[in-house]
Amino acid sequence: MAKASTTTTINPAEAAHFGKLAADWWDPTGSSAMLHKLNPVRLRFIRAAIDAHWPGHKGSFRPLIGRSALDVGCGAGLLCEPLARLGADVTGVDAAPENVAAAQHHAEGSGLAIAYRCADVAAMDGQFDLVTSMEVIEHVTDPAAFIAALADRLAPSGLMILSTPNRTGKSKLAMITVAEGLGAIPKGTHDWDKFLTPDELTPLLEAAGLRIGMVRGIAFSASGGLHLSDDLSLNYILTATPA
């Protein structure tokens, strides 16, 4: 895999924006309400990907027992806690100290031992069996360097899972014009010009020595809400493994 630069990919303005949301991150009716609706959809994909990659524990309540997981851009721990419940030894990393503090507080209240760090993934050491980063790459200063840093943290037989909005007319309408315009997502959360299409993300993964596996869209319908789909035009989630 490509060796990542130690140059930071953190955007201080983005970190500050998300840090302001830390206090009610775990409130399903607060500023992160959309994440609470999105998280179960992500988890369905993540569980299927885990079962496909490590079939020995398929169907188990704790398929990640004995494995390490790193969630990059973890916020207040909305994904870290389910990964811990699946048995993983979890580390969560975020650029906003407010998020790390909120994550630590919630994990302690939930009786979960999760290692949270306010850090840049490019400056970390060690490797992990599972590396996840949900809706983060569109907020960094250098997507290629960010992917390379994630790849450096991935164990040779590990699994990476990424999700990000697609840069389409539909995503601009749904996520910025409508969702941010109506207050369903805090204003300023997204910069549509920084969204990556699958055709743009693929060569970044390949340059970092990774091969794409499963790819699904996350779509929305009035009847079904957010759900996994073959339609990648709004948001997509994928797996990658060392080539």
Predicted regions and their residues:
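Short, flexible, mixed-charge acidic loops at enzyme active sites
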Residues: 171-181
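Acceptor-substrate binding/catalytic loop of class I
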Residues: 164, 183-200
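Conserved hydrophobic residues forming the short capping helix/wall of the S-adenosyl-L-methionine
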Residues: 50, 54, 107, 205
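Core SAM-dependent methyltransferase catalytic element
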Residues: 226-243
